[in-house]
Amino acid sequence: MNRNINSIKYISEETKMLILNEKDEFTSDKLKQFILELNIKFPHIVYAQAKLESHNFKSRIFRENHNLFGMKVARKRPTTNKGEQYNHAYFDSWKDCVVDYAFYQAAYLSDLKTEHEYLEYLKLNYAEDGKYIQKVKQLSRLPW
């Protein structure tokens, strides 16, 4: 299951530590750039998920937990979360949350090749709202 954690592409270990330790303010442009830097699969869909899950980056879970994706505490994979608050994982920074999502993808989604496969996985294993995929698709079509 964890065999693909090393598939996350970092320029170097030094860069990885700089990224994780940097405590800069959140902007949607910084999120887009960071998703690309981490080589996260299907970046426009992941960005749409973050926007949807965080209620356009305004939810309490995002503001207080730095949790962009509504992630629960990971129990069976590497994680950057620091614990649980409001029934969701909390992180030291929004960047830690994005790194955690990269770990999630590496652990569970590395074999998925197409957007269709990814959306199908989300529908069956991630979405709590019956219209989640429809909403993500709609948001992912917006320019970013």
Could you describe each region identified by the protein language model?
Residues M1-W144:
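Catalytic cores of secreted/periplasmic lytic hydrolases that degrade extracellular macromolecules
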